[in-house]
Amino acid sequence: MDATELGVSGEGEEIDMEVMRPLIESEDRFEGTYGEKKHLQRYLNSDNKKDEEVMKPLIENEDDSDGTCDEHQYLQRHPDLDNKDGLTFFQTLIHLLKGNIGTGLLGLPLAMKNAGVLLGPISLLFFGIISIHCMNILVRCSHFLCQRYKKANLGYSDTVGLALEVGPGVLQRHASFGRNLVDWFLVVTQLGFCSVYFVFLAENIKQVFEVFLETKLQQSEIGIWSLDLRIYMFSFLPLIIPLVFIRDLKNLSLLSFFANVSMAISLLIVYQYVIRNLSDPRTLPLGTSWKTYPLFFGTAIFAFEGIGVVLPLENRMRDKKDFSKALNIGMAIVTTLYISLATLGYFCFGDQIKGSITLNLPQDSWLYQLVKILYSFGIYVTYAIQYYVPAEIILPAVTSRVQKTRKLLCEFTMRFFLVCLTCAVAVLIPRLDLVISFVGAVSSSTLALILPPLVEIITYHKENLSPWVIMKDVGIAVIGFVGFIAGTYVTIEEMIYPISYVPPNVSHSDFGVLNNTVLEGH
């Protein structure tokens, strides 16, 4: 609000602005120009709950379907009121586990192959510790900015934007860019997840269906045939499209509950199989070449990229002072789960490990075929939840540019386009390991490793950070950046020249013939 909007004459503008200054300034001390303060106050008055609303589907309670928790009332409630109906410690812990366990977990045994039986577990532990530390950094920076500028809560992109806004002068004018950058990487990450789901569903259901078909055809003495993997991807498109038109995800709460149960049962069955069928780890390499390690990095960071749900969870927790404990316990469990399944899976299947460990399970047992069906059901339902995030970021920006009478048509068109886009990416890169590694290297490394330490340096730039903290933050950001560059380069090279991918039962000498028809090996 300026002086002219208040009906003040130009001559008295300076006096009136002095009078009105308390209405537009923060009560806390802020060292900067008056113009900077006005710009900051406009930023603070923006809708900083957008991140929480966008990421909300990833942290919803499964018991919301009973009507005991009205989400709309929660979101409309004044943010400064008591969070009496917030998440308990146990609920927060469960949501942290749910937000970090998905297809990335099943791809870690193959990632272990790209790192080695010794270097792999050590690297996973290292990346796990760094990821947890970066999550805590983001939470601390959010708390600092909230307390200093009297905000109830902040999301990821708002935290980055406000940190830039109150940072050094050269960065202040880039606050909007910082927020948009985080939103863009969130969109890339979530749509990347959705593309991974297409490949995962196609590979697992293809295997189940063709084993079933093979059994029937052998009984009738008819020749065995195999469909291209891309046919299965396209066949899932009409099944997934209806999911993305569901606006209120509470309608999926019951399905989401059964999906989580299905995935948990599947993991238990996978664990018991690999533990009972361990091979001698001394036959496996301790380490691998630098050319395959970036693929490991991308997959590992993809698996650990749960930082997008951290602040929304903390904002909805009933007793926020316990969040750090829940975060550390939850991520410690996740890290243990990752290292154990990755190591045991690689010990069990060795060099024959595939993009998803479920694809290595025996095909002649109904129990292990059921594992693929159950986990695929869980991933199918999860698609709608992951898709919600980029849709809520992209759709408002697009529909705001069209006439009101065409907004609904525009929204439906964009929803249809985005789901087709994720399918197209899966068709173009029909290898589960490469899609996971590419998404991890490009966007997950930025969100999980690069931005949090830089945000800490900017947020506390006036608080006399110790040289050790600055060196630590710069070191983490450099690791993330090197992984970003190397992982992206090696993954793209592998897409063009897939020399490290050898389908099962195919020798390296014969693989040159199949290099251009890799789909037939799935």
From Swiss-Prot:
Family recorded in the similarity comment:
Belongs to the amino acid/polyamine transporter 2 family.
Please give the residues the UniProt entry marks as glycosylated: N515
Q: State the name under which the record lists this protein.
A: Neutral amino acid uniporter 4
Might you name a Gene Ontology BP term for this protein? L-alanine transport
What exactly does this protein do?
Answer: Uniporter that mediates the transport of neutral amino acids like L-tryptophan, proline and alanine. The transport activity is sodium ions-independent, electroneutral and therefore functions via facilitated diffusion.
- List the PANTHER family hit by this protein, alphabetically: AMINO ACID TRANSPORTER (PTHR22950), NEUTRAL AMINO ACID UNIPORTER 4 (PTHR22950:SF190)
Q: Which GO terms describe its molecular function?
A: L-alanine transmembrane transporter activity; L-proline transmembrane transporter activity; symporter activity
Record's GO cellular component terms: lysosomal membrane; vacuolar membrane
Indicate the transmembrane segments per the record.
115-135, 181-201, 226-246, 255-275, 293-313, 329-349, 377-397, 409-429, 435-455, 467-487
Origin species, per record, is: Xenopus laevis
What reaction does this catalyse? Answer: L-tryptophan(in) = L-tryptophan(out); L-alanine(in) = L-alanine(out); L-proline(in) = L-proline(out)
